[in-house]
Curated annotation (Swiss-Prot):
Cystines in this chain: none
Name of the protein in its database record: UPF0178 protein Pcar_2632
Superkingdom of this protein's organism: Bacteria
PANTHER family given in the database record: UPF0178 PROTEIN YAII
CDD domains found in the cross-reference section: PIN_YqxD-like (cd18720)
Length: 148
């Protein structure tokens, strides 16, 4: 099992939690982004630079992903592709996307997109807070305990 991180939009505090988890468990983790970023020295933590472009990181993650791998992303269409391929997807707020909930999340995303396209200001997600960080750390720990 590997961890893949959609790193372009992943909050720094979530990356720090992931770095600690990779070092603690020895699970291989790869951050995928279209710009350079620092990663701590570790045989378990890797970085993959992809070309700039719409969904370039997403496409690379889906291409490299094996069934059973975990992907960290807030991108719902990417999460849907991961689940379709037999992987697991966890967002930075600690929500595990599943076969049971991904269609609902996609429908809500599409609905919000249509509202924005018609000129309605839907606002954005709330800032990541301490309870979100804790929820992510707890869910990640639960996942790794079951799958490593």
């Amino acid at each position: 099992m590997k961890i893949w991180v959609d790193a372009d939009a992943c909050p720094a505090v979530i990356k720090e939690i992931l770095f600690k988890a990779a070092r603690r468990t020895g699970v291989s983790m790869t951050l995928v982004a279209n710009h350079l970023m620092r990663i701590p020295p570790s045989p378990h933590i890797h970085f993959m630079l992809v070309a700039a472009g719409l969904d370039a990181a997403d496409n690379e993650i889906v291409k490299k992903l094996d069934a059973g791998d975990l992907v960290i992303t807030a991108d719902i269409p990417l999460a849907a592709q991961v689940i379709e391929k037999g992987g697991h997807a966890l967002n930075p707020r600690g929500e595990l996307y599943t076969v049971d909930n991904i269609r609902e999340r996609l429908s809500m995303r599409d609905f919000m997109d249509s509202l924005r396209a018609s000129g309605i200001d839907t606002g954005g997600p709330a800032a990541l807070n301490q309870s979100d960080r804790q929820a992510f750390a707890n869910r990640l720990d639960q996942f790794l305990t079951r799958h490593v």
